[in-house]
């Protein structure tokens, strides 16, 4: 069984209001563009890979009418992510001993850089040491819940769809995965998804069937 995790809200904790407040301090109202499960406007474009960080920063300057620095804009956007609790990392390491682990996420270059350089690694480690495959919206040009994104995952992993278990905090995304034949479970943002697994990291029998 391959276990596929969402990133934001499942592994990393999110604080939308903290991000909105960070942009407000810069004089920019982010609220109309930011969502919990999906983004709009320029935020959607950076999550689909249709715009890079320079374009993102330029759009914020254009909309705000303020001469904001790229670094300040990027730091404010990074404020959306807070931390990956240690117990979740420890559980992932135990799960990996029994199951192939992957990530499937609507994310962007700034947020994933935090994953690669801060959240998932110890000195000398790489994200690839924990996850065998990483599927990111901004690299794929697709976003959940688009059917094509899940089909690409199935094609890449070369495993029967019913042997792929997707954990996401959005029921819309979970249902989209099920429509392609994948299995899916809601993964609450409070980390209680860890209860799907035994203490040693094995998926509990009732979820294997």
Question: What are these model-derived regions, one by one?
Answer:
Residues 6-9, 49, 103, 134, ...:
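Generic structural signal for small/hydrophobic residues in well-ordered secondary structure
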Residues 20, 89-93, 103, 150, ...:
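Short amphipathic alpha-helical segments and helix-helix/interface helices
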Residues 101-103, 184:
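Hydrophobic beta-strand scaffold residues
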Residues 4, 104, 166-167:
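Generic enzyme active-site microenvironment
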Residues 1-86, 97, 108-114:
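N-terminal helical cap/lid subdomain that shapes the substrate entry/recognition surface
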Residues 93-97, 178:
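Anion (oxyanion) recognition and catalysis
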Residues 108-109, 115-209:
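Asp-based, Mg2+/Mn2+-dependent phosphohydrolase catalytic module
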Residues 1, 99-100, 162-163:
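Short coil/turn segments at beta-strand junctions that form active-site/ligand-binding loops
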């Amino acid at each position: 069984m391959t276990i596929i995790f969402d990133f934001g809200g499942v592994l990393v904790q999110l604080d939308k209001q903290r991000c909105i407040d960070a942009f407000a301090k810069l004089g920019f109202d982010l609220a109309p563009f930011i969502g919990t499960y999906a983004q709009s406007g320029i935020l959607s474009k950076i999550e689909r890979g249709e715009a890079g960080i320079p374009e993102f920063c330029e759009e914020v300057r254009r909309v705000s009418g303020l001469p904001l620095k790229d670094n300040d804009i990027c730091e404010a956007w990074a404020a959306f992510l807070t931390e990956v609790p240690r117990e979740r990392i420890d559980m992932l390491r135990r799960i990996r001993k029994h199951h192939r682990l992957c990530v499937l996420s609507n994310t962007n270059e700034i947020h994933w850089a935090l994953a690669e350089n801060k959240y998932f690694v110890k000195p000398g480690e790489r994200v690839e040491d924990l996850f065998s495959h990483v599927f990111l919206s901004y690299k794929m040009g697709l976003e959940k819940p688009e059917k094509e994104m899940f089909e690409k995952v199935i094609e890449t992993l070369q495993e029967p769809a019913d042997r792929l278990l997707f954990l996401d905090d959005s029921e819309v995304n979970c249902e989209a995965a099920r429509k392609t034949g994948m299995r899916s479970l809601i993964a609450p943002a409070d980390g209680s998804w860890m209860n799907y697994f035994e203490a040693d990291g094995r998926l509990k029998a009732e979820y294997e069937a």
